[in-house]
């Protein structure tokens, strides 16, 4: 008798589990609207991080290019000083070359302190990650509902990724 009772309970439990799985895999309009909103926000964050990357790239180049030019010129000047600078002007030329070297060092130190290259790269990586989230959501929503991943599973994945990106992305 208890075996029959256990079989009935097991069947009932299996039916309830199947209904619950079906309920969790069904897509509702609210879920689609929520995901569409997340996709739109992801697209906005991608754009904002792209703008920040461009800003930091420009700032990084404004430090890097002058340092490269000054270092190249002072290196060449040091090498050519004996050949082209008359003896009476050598001290002045050496002081000028040394001053330019010091200026290049100061600019390089400021560049390292301001971390423009790191900020540029972190915004680039964040923009790519936000773009990926947007693309994943848009692709899933473009599919017919029966061909999509289970709704609850996909929402949980997207929520976790959205939260991770919010926490790990650099400030804009």
Residue ranges and their predicted role:
Residues 2-69, 80, 93, 99, ...:
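Conserved non-transmembrane functional hotspots
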Residues 64, 87-88:
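Short, surface-exposed helix-loop/turn micro-motifs enriched in polar/charged residues
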Residues 70-87:
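Juxtamembrane "helix exit" motif at the C-terminal ends of alpha-helical transmembrane segments
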